[in-house]
Amino acid sequence: MKDIKARKQVEKSGAACFDRAFGSKGRGKNLMSSSIETIKSSLCKAGLRLLAEGLVARTWGNISIRIDERRMAVTPSGIMYEDILPEHIAVMDIITGRWESTVRPSGEKKLHAAIYRERPDVGAIVHTHQMNASVCAAARVDVEVNDRAAADILRASKIYCSGYGRPGTGKLTKETVSVLKGGMCALMANHGAVCLGKDIDEAFTVSRILENVCGTFLAEKISAASPSAVMTAENICRIYLHIRASGARS
């Protein structure tokens, strides 16, 4: 009887987390097995989406989806996204770190697990090497979010950059988790960005908005640093008069 009750509790917990990620329509009689297979399939598709949206190259980056309160599914290490199959997706206990898969899971699995432990509101995580965010991360700068709509989605008025930690290390995990501060993304010093969401679609939305915010930030910094590059009204007028005098037409 105790085993039956325990199993029902796990299934109930899994249903709630699965609903957050995919909606209650995805639930069936064989919840645990069907939800895990659905999640694995979703991760395979998400990997192709990473490439299509220019967020990573080759085998860079990684993605995970929460299965339930204790488990997550995460992409493998060292396999091209075009070649990832459902059996390559690891199921990992976010408390013990134990995992099951035919291949090694991502080297950043501990980072994903730590975020899920700290943030019960998070259902999916995407680690990217997107251009603008990676430039800001390499410069190790915090990025102001001046667009209110973007700030609402990112849940932050400033995107913080973590201290440096080598890939796959406890230091990287600790530094990254410490700067999330309840927000939906963070920059990882010299290592790209991490974007969160209640589901995989929201995590991708966060990554796109982060890229736009970082692009605006960089453009403003470049403009401020190069005032001489801005054309003065006098020079614009002189160019106009020169073109007019030469008889040239646009």
Residue ranges of predicted features:
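Residue-identity detector for glycine
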Residues: 14, 23-28
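Cationic, low-complexity basic patches in intrinsically disordered or flexible, solvent-exposed regions
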Residues: 9, 13
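Glycine-rich flexible loops
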Residues: 27-250
